[in-house]
Amino acid sequence: QEDIEAGKQKSATCTACHGQEGNST
């Protein structure tokens, strides 16, 4: 689960541009 938590923190910066689904805006 450590990887999951790390992934959530990394995805937070990604979602700013790509959105929660991972799609580019």
UniProtKB/Swiss-Prot annotation:
GO molecular function: electron transfer activity; heme binding; metal ion binding
Name assigned to this protein: Putative cytochrome c4
Signal peptide: none
Record's subcellular location: Periplasm
PTM info: Binds 2 heme groups per subunit.
Purpose: Diheme, high potential cytochrome c believed to be an intermediate electron donor to terminal oxidation systems.
SUPFAM superfamilies for this protein: Cytochrome c
InterPro entries named in the record: Cyt_c-like_dom_sf
Native species: Aliivibrio fischeri
Superkingdom classification of source: Bacteria
UniProt keywords, alphabetically: Electron transport, Heme, Iron, Metal-binding, Periplasm, Transport
Region feature Disordered, mapped onto this chain: 1-25
Binding residues for heme: 14, 17
A Gene Ontology term for the protein's cellular component: periplasmic space
